[in-house]
C-alpha cells in the first residue's frame, strides 16, 4: 500500500506538494507516512484542482481541511502513542482509517484490559514469592526505624502512662526561681484565674482565693460558699490539725513570698497554687499514712529524716487562711489547699464534689499512725519525715484515667464521606502507576509504588511495626517469635497488614495486600469491627465494593489515637 501511495504522488506532483504542507514540524517519517495515507484517503474534493484554487480556498473548505487534519493526528496518536478519545471520536477515526495497514505499531495495554487480564489469571493470596525490596528502600527504612520503634513502645505502655498524666491538678501558675538559705525557692509571680475545674467527675476540684479578706472563690463558682454548716465543722478540724505543724515551718512576710523545698528529691509533683493578681494560695495534698501501701490516693512516702518539703506564700493585702479539699471520682483521692493566716484569725472553707464523709475518711486515713506528711505547705514534725513523691493509683481509677487520654467517639457516615473522595483519586493514581510498570506482578516494588501514589496526592503513608509476640489476638508458636507485623494506614484509614522476618519484608507484604484492593472495580471506606488488645473496636477500613470483611487482622494502634 505504501508503494501505491508513492506511485500516486509521483504521478501527481501538485497533490504531493499540497499534502506536504500538512506535515507537522518534527514529525517522524514513520508517523507521517501513515498519516499522509490517512489524509489522501479522506481528502476527497478537498484536494485543489489547480494552484490558483489552492491559494484561494473558501472558509468552508478551510474548516473541513482543519477537521481532517485533526482526525488524522488523533488517529496517529491512538495508533503510535496509545491515546484514547471519546467514543464518538474513536468510532469516527477508526472508520476513516479502514484499509490502512500499520505493521510496526507498538502494543498498548489499557487499564481495563489490564484489570481483565489480572482477574482472568487470578491472584495468589499467599505470602510466598515476595522479593526483598531494593537496598535503597532498606536504607530509607533504617532512617525511619527510630520513629517506628517509638510507635511500638508507646503502644505497649499506654495504660501505665495514662495514670501518671492525669494525676496533676488542672490549676496553673507562672513562677520564678530564687535561692534562700541555701535551698531552692520558688515564688509565684502572677496567677492566672481559673474559670472552671469541676467539668468532669474524674478531675480534681481546685479552689482560689480573692484579694478581699472575707471572700472565698472556688473553681466551680461562688455559689459553693453557701454550703451546709456541717462542712465548716470538718474544715475547722482540718485547720486545727494542720496548724501545729504549720507554725514551726512556715515563715510569713507581708512583702516577700517565699517557698522552701528539698533541692532534688523534694521536687514538687503535686498541684501548684492558682490565685488572682493580688492574692496567693497554697495547695496541699491531703495527709496520708506511710504504713498503708494500697491507699488509693496520692500517698506521702517517707524519705530521709533530713528531707522536708514546705512552701509558704504570703500576700501583701490579704493573708486569710483558706483550706479547700478536692475529691475526685474515686472516693479515696482528695486534696486540700491552705492560705497563710492573718493575725491568728482563720476562716476555712471545705469544698467537696461528693460528701463530707468521704473527705473525713481520706483525712483520717492513717492506719498505722506512724507519721504525718505534707507535700507543698507543711514540713514534718520533729520525729516525722515527709516528701513530695506521688504514687499512681492501683485501683479502678487507673482505667478511668487511661480512658480519657484520647476522647473516644463513635464513627459515623460523616467520617466516611470525608475520606471517600481521597481514595477515589488514589484509585486512579494507583491504576495509572500500575499501567506504567506493566501491571501487578511479584517483581514490582509494591511499597515504593503505593508510597509514590500517595505522595502524588500530597498525603502520607503511615507505617506501624509491632513484634508478633506482643499481639494477644494472634496464635503464638516458636517459629513466629521473631517475626514483625506491619500495618499501613493513610488518612486514618486501614489499608493492610503484613508479617515478615524483618521490617522491610513485613512492609512489602502489607503493601502488596493493600495494592490488591486497587485491582477491583471500586474501593470504598467502611466502618468495621477489629480486635485491639482483646476487645472489639471500630475502625475505618478500605475495602473493595463487593468485599465482606471477615476476620480482619488485629489493630496495632488504637484508631482513635490517629484521628
From Swiss-Prot:
Domain XRN2-binding (XTBD), residue spans: 19-126
GO process terms (BP): DNA damage response; negative regulation of cell growth; positive regulation of cell growth; positive regulation of signal transduction; regulation of protein stability
Modified residues (Phosphothreonine): 340
Molecular function terms from GO: p53 binding; RNA binding
Region (Disordered): 122-289, 304-351
Assigned GO CC terms: granular component; nucleoplasm; nucleus
InterPro entries reported for this sequence: dsRBD_dom, XTBD
Modified residues (N-acetylalanine): 2
Changes after translation: May be ubiquitinated.
Keywords in alphabetical order: Acetylation, Isopeptide bond, Nucleus, Phosphoprotein, RNA-binding, Ubl conjugation
DRBM domain sequence ranges: 445-520
Subunit structure: Interacts with CDKN2A/p14ARF, p53/TP53 and MDM2. Interacts with CHEK2 and MAPK3. Interacts with XRN2.
Similarity field: Belongs to the CARF family.
Protein name, per record: CDKN2A-interacting protein
Organism: Mus musculus
